[in-house]
From Swiss-Prot:
It holds the Pfam family IPPT. Residues 50-53 are annotated as: Interaction with substrate tRNA. Its EC number is 2.5.1.75. Its cofactor is Mg(2+). It catalyses: adenosine(37) in tRNA + dimethylallyl diphosphate = N(6)-dimethylallyladenosine(37) in tRNA + diphosphate. InterPro entries: Dimethylallyltransferase, IPT, P-loop_NTPase. GO terms for biological process: tRNA modification. This is tRNA dimethylallyltransferase 1. The record marks 116, 138 as: Interaction with substrate tRNA. It comes from the Bacteria. The gene is miaA1. ATP binds at residues 9-16. GO terms for molecular function: ATP binding; tRNA dimethylallyltransferase activity. Belongs to the IPP transferase family.
Amino acid sequence: MVPVLIFFGATASGKTSLASEIFSYKHSKDFSKEGGISALSACAEIISADSVQVYKHMHIGSASPSKEELEDLPHHLIAIKEPSEEFSAADFVKEADKLCPEIYRRGKLPVLMGGTAFFLKNFLYGLPVTPTADPKIREHFQKRAKEEGAGILLEELKKIDPETAERLHVHDEYRIIRAHEVFAASGKPLSSFALPENPREKYEFFILSIERTRSLLYERIEKRVDAMFAEGLYDEVKKLYEMGYTSESPGLKAIGYREFFDENKRLKPESDLEEVSALIKRNTKHYAKRQETFFKTIPDVHRYFIEDKAEISRLYKDICGFYKKLLK
C-alpha cells in the first residue's frame, strides 16, 4: 500500500510556501531531528492538484511555484498542457496514479497538493462510472455552446440536473457539456452517478487541511491579486491573447484570466484594469469559500489553523509520524 499525503488549502492560504518550508531538502536535517528518521527518507515530491497550474504560459495568474521552489522541491503536473487543451479530473487521476508509486519507489512521499477539490476528491474515492462520451453528442453541445453560449446550456441543465448545475460556473463549459452528454446518453443526471463511499484501498491516505480565519484569507487574496498585477499579470494575459488564445480556451476560463475578456471575447484595454482587479478579487473570494465548504464534506481530515504557531508545530510532527511508514 502506497502512503499518500493530501495537502489541501483554499486559494491564497499559503500552501506552496508552507510545503516548501516543510518538505524541501534544506530542511531535511530538521525532519531527521524532529521525527527520528533519516534525511534521505525525509524528502517528498509534490503532485500539483491545481487545474490552472497545469497550463503553460500562465505562471503569474496561476500562482505557480517560483523557479527556486521548483529547484528545491520536485513538482509534477506543472505547466504540462497548452491553454487550448482540456485537463479533466480523469486525466489528473490517471497521471497521479502513475506518479505516486514511482515517487514511493524512490523512497519519497507522494504529496498531492492543491485546491482543486474535484481533482482531489476523485483521486481519493475514484472516478464515478459514467457513460462513455459519444463524439456526436459532444459535438452537438459544443456547437450549441459556441452559437448560443454556455449560459443557455447551464440554464437548461438546472432543469434536468439542478445538483450539478448548482456547483458549475457559466465559464465551466467543459463540465456543462459533459453533464448534458451524460443525461443525453443515459437519461440520468450526472449527479446520480455517485462517487464510491470509501477511499481507494490501494493507498494509505493522510489528509490535512490548512485553514485561516475568513477575514485573514480574504486579506491575503486582496494582497495576492495586487502582487500579481504588479508582477505583470496583464502582460501575461496579453501575450496569451497574441498567441491566439481567447476566453474560450480551457486554460483562460480560469479565475484570474477570464476577467480580462469582454463579452465579445476581446481583451479589455488597460484602462479597465481596476475593474478587472476588483472582479478577480471578488471571484477568488467566492471560490475560496466554495473550497472551504467542499472540504468540510471529507471525513477524517486533520485540520490545522496555521495562524497559530503551535498548530504548525503539530502539523510538522504529524507529517513526520506519517513519514515513518516509508521505512517499513
